[in-house]
A protein has these predicted regions:
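Unchanged
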Residues: 1-190
Length: 190
C-alpha cells in the first residue's frame, strides 16, 4: 500500500532527565550504535514506506547528525526519500511545534505535495516492531477516517504519562485524554 511516513521526533522528556539534557529522546543510544528512532524507521522500511519525513525540534543536533549520516533504512530519493524538518520561524510564525497537530500543520505543504493516499504517523522514541501494512489493511477494512494503534498497559505501570483511550465494542474511540493527572483506564495510544 502506498503511504507516506511521518515520524514525530521533536519532543523533550522530563522523565528522562539527565539523559535528554543534550539530545533528543529519539537520538538516545540503544545497544551501542542504534538510536531509538532507528526502530521506527526500520518499521517504515520493512512496511515498504519509501517517503518519510522526520519532524525534529528539541536538542536535535545529534539526531540530525544521525539521520544525515546513516543509510541504514534505504530511503533513496528516487524512490521517495528521508526528509528532516525543524520548525521554521517566520514573521508570521515564531513558535516551535506546539504539539503533534501543530507539527503536522506547520509542514502541511510537504503532505500536500505528496501523492500517496495514506499517511502513517509514528513516534520516533518508541522501541517496538510493527508492520504498518497490517495497520493500513485494518484502517481500509474499517473504512475509518483515521486509525490509532493502542496497547494495554500493565497494571503496575503508570498510564498517566500517555494518551488514555476509551473504545466501544467495535474498537471505535469514544474518548481520548492526553496525559491525564489521574488515568481512568489502562488502554494507551502506542
Amino acid at each position: 500500500m502506498r503511504a507516506i511516513g511521518i515520524v514525530l521526533a521533536g519532543g523533550n522528556s522530563s522523565r528522562m532527565k539527565e539523559l535528554s539534557n543534550k539530545r533528543a529522546i529519539a537520538a538516545m543510544p540503544i545497544a551501542g550504535s542504534f538510536r531509538s528512532i532507528d526502530f521506527t524507521l526500520s518499521n517504515m522500511t520493512n512496511s515498504h514506506i519509501q517517503k518519510v519525513a522526520v519532524f525534529t525540534q528539541y536538542n536535535a543536533k545529534s539526531l540530525n547528525e544521525h539521520l544525515n549520516s546513516s543509510k541504514w533504512w534505504d530511503f533513496g530519493r528516487k524512490q521517495g526519500g528521508l526528509y528532516v524538518f525543524t520548525p521554521t520561524t517566520t514573521p508570521d510564525n515564531s513558535y516551535w511545534y506546539r504539539g503533534t497537530a501543530d507539527a503536522i500543520a506547520q509542514n502541511i505543504g510537504f503532505l500536500k505535495s505528496s501523492h500517496e493516499p495514506y499517511v502513517v504517523i509514528a513516534s520516533g522514541d518508541g522501541v517496538y516492531k510493527m508492520d504498518y501494512n497490517k495497520v493500513l489493511e485494518y484502517h481500509i477494512a474499517k473504512k475509518a477516517d483515521f486509525t490509532v494503534v493502542t496497547t494495554d498497559m500493565n497494571e503496575k505501570d503508570d498510564p498517566s504519562r500517555f494518551g488514555i483511550v476509551s473504545t466501544d465494542m467495535d474498537g471505535r474511540i469514544t474518548n481520548f485524554e492526553e496525559k491525564p493527572i489521574q488515568a481512568k483506564g489502562q488502554q494507551v495510544s502506542a
